[in-house]
Structures are given as structure tokens and as C-alpha cells.
């Protein structure tokens, strides 16, 4: 699918609710800090949109008011972004949304069969498995961004069909998966895969930074999305901190490949993401 046609993972209301949940305001605190009445806050949290109310609320939630309103008014989408040669994205349904998984290989590697690595599995690995066969790719590893069900659902089938090894960060606990400490670097052909801890949404979330393709590529799972980020299920503060330090500090041209929603770049998220 054309990246410009992939809808954003989160609406403005999703962003606001993630911030409210993450900050755990005591009763009445949000009203007193924002200067908004309980009635007005109730309207906002039920999806009633007024730009001036969002501008009043955003700073209290640590959100950028202009970026939040741009999201609410439909003024932000990453638009047309293409994947570089050597990476493929697969999109599969999961309940009422979709989840992405990825294959990466060295496009400059010679030989009939090239090594490849997968990142997550999605809900159905059939298309990925067919792609491996049609493109003469030999799957060596399946790297997991985190262990949530929509990202690992078809892991057993991929391992059975390809005999690949599955790996994840050492704070996750997916049965049968080898563990590594983030900071470790892997190689496939001439490509380098650097692992970075981006926990907060999951306790062992990992971002994989791939160097050696046409541009740097960060496969981030649910750490960050175009215009949003994964909810702080484990730690909201850690989500914000690790996204800033491990993803948004990367070169501006770095392609961000998320688990949901459209592709984006470090430059675009530094300009448009309301959380940062």
C-alpha cells in the first residue's frame, strides 16, 4: 500500500488519552493545572474538539499545542515515503487494526540465496514466507521488537518453516526465544543491526537500527508512531525518555518503520509529533 494511504495509528483523542493515563493526575489536579472546567475536560475526553480548548490543555499534558492541533485538524501525515531496496513490509489484520512486520536483506550481496532477517511476525506470516521463497532469501533470524501478541502471533510457524533463530531483548519473556542485552550489534552481509533499548510500552522493547542500506532504518515496534507513540503500559516516562534518546536523536533522514500506521522519519517526528 502507498504510505500516503495508510491511516495514522492514533487520533488526537488517542494522544490526549495516552498522556492523561500516563501522567496519573490526582482527582481535580488536571482541572486546576489546565484552568479548564470538569465539564470542558469531559467534552474533550469524549471527543468534542475545540482548538482553543486543546491549546489550553496541551501544555498541562506535556504535549505541543500546535502539533496536537495540526493532528486534530488533519494537517499532519508523513505522506509518500518509499522503502529502500533491501527491506519489505508486510501488513496483517489484528482484531480491528493492522500490524506491520518487516524483512531485511543485503541487496548488494551476491549469490543465488541471500541471508535475510525478519522483525516481528504480525498475525499471519504467509506473505512473508512466500516472499522469502520468491526472492530466494534464507531467513537467519527473527528479531522481536517486543512480545505483545500482535507482533509475535505467527512466530512458531516461521521458526518451523525456516529454522530461523528468534531473538529479543533480555527483559522480555517470549517462550523459546533467545535473549540479548540491548547494545549488541548483529550483522547480515554488509549490513549492521544495532540494538537500542526503547522500553516503556513494553518492559523489554527494542529498536533495531539498520545501517548499510540507502538510508538508516529504525524498526521501532510500538515505541513511536507517526504523530504519536505507544502507550506507556509499563512506564510513560520511559516511553518519552527512550524515544527522545534512542530514536529522535538519530540522523534526520533515518526512516522509522513502526509496528502500526505509516512510515515516517526522524525529521518529520521531531517537527510534528505532539509528544516531543
Give the residues covered by each predicted segment.
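A short, Lys/Arg-rich alpha-helix, primarily the initiator
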Residues: 1-23
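Metallo-beta-lactamase
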Residues: 2, 113, 203-276
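Short alpha-helical "recognition helix" segments of helix-turn-helix
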Residues: 26-31, 57
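Recognition helix of helix-turn-helix/homeodomain-like DNA-binding domains
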Residues: 35-49
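DNA major-groove recognition helix of helix-turn-helix/homeodomain DNA-binding modules
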Residues: 52-67
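Conserved beta-strand hairpin/beta-sheet module of binuclear metal-dependent hydrolase folds
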Residues: 79-134, 208-221, 227
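Core dinuclear metal-dependent hydrolase active-site scaffold
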Residues: 103, 185-213, 249
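Active-site HxH/HxHxD metal-binding segment of metal-dependent hydrolases
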Residues: 113-116, 124-192
